[in-house]
Each structure stands twice: as structure tokens, then as C-alpha cells.
Amino acid sequence: MDEEIYEKYILAGKIASKAREYGKNLIKPDVSFLDVTEKVESKIKNLGADLSFPVNIAVNNIAAHYSPRNDDKLVFKKGDLVKLDVGTHIDGYIADTAVTMQVETEKYNDIINASSDALDVAIENIKPGIKLSEIGKKVEEKISSFGFKPINNLTGHSLKRYILHAGLAVPSVFDITNMSKPKVDDVIAIEPFATDGAGHVISGDGSNIYLCNKSFKSRLIRNKKSRILFERFKKRFKTLPFAQRWAEKHFEKSDIILRRLSYLGYLKHFPQLLDQKNGIVSQKEHTVIINENGCEVTT
């Protein structure tokens, strides 16, 4: 890997790690999702990075994909299990990291440890040439040893410049069909999820997170304002996800346009992902760079 690119990955990782720990300490009863989200996003920018996706907050049975709107009224409550997922980039070189914490309770210690220990096992074993299905097997065994289920349809993912999901998938279960093998210099976000529910996520309500469909041409959009905004979205956010509240801050009256462009397929609106049986879900995530000896954790 080019030294300059390597340094950008390392810096993105250091900033993501600092932002994750900063955000973790903000989560307390009666604090709003929006307040934590905006403070963490500001922290990332103040430390010199940009966001590779909106800060995600997923509580209890929600596994992933929620970022508050500007008018969001949700607050953390005592007894919540909270996943905080943070993404940064330096010049497009991405870091992705997540942590789970419990709000003024200790009843979730085991499920938090299940995903955390599973991540440790994955990091210890990943190396060039290993089948990612074997990593999934080790993750599944570790989570199962705690009495929980891994989520079988959420995976870790490789990262490339300005691309958050770049091809490789790191499962949390043994997937015999996954014959992929990482190679030296691959950058991968590994993120085991553990649950006391079904071990399978389904789509819920909207997440307020969008992504431009780069294959769609703006000239085919008949509505002039929609066409102009789509071009602006693509220019500003490129191939990375963005929050509805970001669009609202930069583009006046964009709410209706977002819905219209999503309906037409020009934008992807991510759904919230929740356990099929409403089980509690924990997550732990680090970004790693594959090297000849195994990997280096950047976050």
C-alpha cells in the first residue's frame, strides 16, 4: 500500500476511535439522540476528518441504520442497550467502528461481551488467504458459547476509497458459499452482531439515511428542482451515505425532494434493521488493514 494512503487510513481510524469513545460517554438517560449525533459528527470534523456516513444510533432490538432527523424527539432511557456506529474518512479513505453500551444497567454484560469477544477472535484469525467463511465459523462459535445467536444476514465489509461496502463480506456465521479470501492491503470492517432473538434481521421504518444511485442520470428527472438537487447531492456526498438532516441544512425544503427521488430510485433510503423476533442486539466493530502477519487495527 502506498505510504500516503496508509497514513490516511491510520488517521481516519484514530479520529473514528476518538469520536466513538467521546460519543459513548455522552449517552445517558434523557439525553437526546440528536444531541449525541451532532456532537459526535462535530467532533469528527474538528479533529480533521469528514464523515463516511451519518452517526448511527441503534437501540435495543434495532441492529443498525438509524440517524435522527432535525426534529427528532427520541432520548436515551435507563435500561437501553445502545449501538453507536461511527464512520470517518480522510480524502475518501474510510474508517468504520462501533461499540455497544448499556444505560445505567449491567444486565446486558453477557451479550455485550459476546459480540466484543467474537470481534477479538475474528481479528486474531484474519489473514491473507483465509476463507472468510472460516472467520464466520469462529465468530459463530464464540457468540454461541455465550448462549446467543449471531445475526446471519449482517456482515462485515471491505472498504475502498469513497466506497463503504466494497465487495468482500465477513459473515458472523459459517457460510459455505462464501469462498472469498482477503489479500494483503485489503481494508475491512469486521462487525459481529449478537442477539437473544431470531438471529436474522428484517427491514423496519426508514432510517433517515440516503445514498445516491450513481447509475441514474439526472437529465431524465423531469422536475427541475429535483434534478438540480440530485446533482447537488451527488457532488457533495459522492458515493457515501448522507443524513436527511444534512440535506435539510444545505438544501432548502429538501424533504419532499428526498421522498420523490427515493420513490423514483434515484436515491436509496435505507430501512432500519431489526431482529425478526425483536431480540436485543449488540455489536462491536473495528476496521483493519490486512498485512502479511495478519492485520492491523486502525480504529
Named regions from a protein language model:
Residues 1-299:
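Active-site neighborhoods and metal-handling regions in enzymes and metal-associated proteins
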